[in-house]
Amino acid sequence: MVLKAIVIDIDGTITNPDRSLDLDVAKRFRELNVPVILSTGNPLCYVHAAAKLIGISGIVIAENGGVISTGFDSPSIIADGKEECEKAYELLSQYHDLVKLDDAYRKTEVVLNRDVAVEDLRSTLSENGIDIEIIDTGYAIHIKSTAMNKGTGLLKVAELMGLEPTDYLAIGDSCNDAEMMQVAGFGIAVANADSDAIKAARHITKASFGKGALEAIEYALSNGLL
């Protein structure tokens, strides 16, 4: 198996524990002979800035698969779903004290501060018959459509790049990386990953955070995956 591209999460995967970028893995990205695609729950402006500063492709997956960009100056592909997320938020606000994050930049989901129990939010939605997904990435709580995730985002990016999803090495640390790992050709979780990411991965690094991502790349190279 020789993979043709890397799709990788940002927070907790190529960052340090303080959320600063790991400069060693950023440098390694620029040395590779395959495209590196950032895939994140963050809004498009954030991930484009990160890609530009790192010096890699402007092809990115943002908002957990809800927004796809094929380049820094290219039109974005934006999924439906923001309206149903807003309706869920309005309902949840009647029962819980919620704080929105980055809402002016969000096109497909509603993101909340992590000061409320996710299970309580899910129970409220279930009791009111609302079919929408709520995930906690360890950095924020995302209210999102069940129809989109980083896996569906990878499917679209692969199509746009003329590749198969199985041509990608996927690297991540969180529950929202699991679907991406499942549809990719090979998935690696860094050592600080949560249980969902670990279950979806085929290999777990010994190192955590950005050093784990660097280890994942070296593992793939030494085992003929890249």
Curated annotation (Swiss-Prot):
A single Pfam family it belongs to is Hydrolase_3
Q: Where, by residue number, does substrate bind?
A: K150
Q: Which UniProt keywords apply?
A: Carbohydrate metabolism, Hydrolase, Magnesium, Metal-binding
Query: What top-tier enzyme class does this entry carry?
Result: hydrolase
Give GO cellular component annotations, separated by semicolons. cytosol
* SUPFAM superfamilies per record: HAD-like
Q: What is the reaction catalyzed? A: 2-phosphoglycolate + H2O = glycolate + phosphate
Source superkingdom: Archaea
Where along the chain is Mg(2+) bound? D9, D11, D173, D177
A molecular function (GO) held by this record is: magnesium ion binding
Q: Which family does it belong to?
A: Belongs to the archaeal SPP-like hydrolase family.
Function (record text): Catalyzes the dephosphorylation of 2-phosphoglycolate.
Report what the protein is called. Phosphoglycolate phosphatase
